[in-house]
Amino acid sequence: MPRVVSTGLVFFFATLLIASEIPKVSDRHWTRKYDPYFRKYSKRFFGPAIDWHWFKAQGIAESGLRENAKSWVNAKGIMQIMPNTFTELKKKNAQLKDVMIPRWNICAGIYYDSILFKKWEEDRKFLDRMRFTMGSYNAGFRTILRAQKVSR
């Protein structure tokens, strides 16, 4: 077996092992305090059929649902919104108030997800579009596009 493949398999199984130790989104380990916001804004920006747990899982991945989280690059709040991104989102959505208030942080994160989601072709499967959306949220839309071109 080539070295790259065996290294990839080791990484895959290590990731699987770690993931099996992380509590599920619905687990009581995670606070339910923000669930109404995840429900409300996922429906507002994605429609009633969307499973709001996508966005709670994103909040867990971004900050562990810590409302006062700040990253080394100054991303803020539960959804780890960059200040410049929040400023741009406020121009398009005047209801957004303060990035550090959980309600508006979650609203901004899901609103941004909806913008990214719409950038991916509609002929893609829903699951692929959501995965690309989540990847774009973290790495940037153009980064994901470049990675796709390299992988072809």
Residue locations for each model-derived region?
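Catalytic glycan-binding domains that act on GlcNAc-containing polysaccharides
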Residues: 20-152
